[in-house]
A protein has these predicted regions:
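Conserved acidic E/D residue at the C-terminus of a beta-strand in Rossmann-like folds
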Residues: 7-8, 163
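Active-site phosphate/pyrophosphate-binding segments
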Residues: 10, 20-149
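Short beta-strand/turn micro-motifs composed of small residues
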Residues: 7, 105, 154
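Single conserved hydrophobic/aromatic residue that forms the stacking wall/gate
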Residues: 159-168
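Hydrophobic membrane-spanning alpha-helices of multi-pass integral membrane proteins
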Residues: 148-151, 156
Length: 168
């Protein structure tokens, strides 16, 4: 078994034990949420997967360049999100008294929901859980009551809600 460590800290136990190491260079984390380390590790995984696909020849012509260009455009997109302070403040003031929050997503968006829920509870101290969207009707929906905050994650336009879920 060959291992690749994706780490932020030079000399960490993973860096020492792995066969190869990718450093993210995120720097020290100030908050408990490890936002920089997580984001840079996600970018490293993306680059690694993209490069593996390029080397294996599984990307169509121009697709590799497009994927790397999209990653390079992230700082500008993050700046736009950060600039939307009024909307963020409006959401926070409207829902700050929520006792519970549920993050839901399907497919890759479920992974975003998991991390979003974790960040939300670590920083806001509001109870939060993440669920796969298709599983909401199998129990978790009974936990949703008046005042519960439900955050739906839908980042891929190719995801469509299935007919049974639409009526749940």
């Amino acid at each position: 078994v060959r291992t690749i460590g994706i780490v932020n800290v030079v000399g960490s136990s993973i860096a020492r034990e792995a066969d190869a190491t990718m450093y993210t260079w995120a720097g020290p984390e100030i908050s408990v949420a490890t936002t920089k380390a997580y984001s840079t590790q996600l970018a490293a995984c993306y680059l690694l997967a993209t490069e593996f696909a390029r080397v294996r020849g599984t990307l169509a012509d121009g697709q590799y360049e497009h994927l790397v260009t999209e990653l390079e455009a992230l700082p500008e997109k993050i700046e736009k999100t950060l600039a939307d302070k009024e909307r963020i403040q409006w959401f926070a003031s409207k829902y700050a008294n929520a006792k519970d929050a549920f993050f839901i997503g399907r497919g890759l968006d479920y992974a975003v929901a998991l991390e979003g829920s974790l960040k939300f509870k670590e920083i806001s101290y509001i109870h939060s859980e993440a669920f796969a969207a298709g599983e909401m009707k199998h129990g978790p929906i009974s936990l949703v009551e008046n005042g519960t905050l439900v955050v739906g994650i839908l980042t891929l336009s190719l995801i469509h809600i299935s007919e049974p879920t639409r009526h749940a």
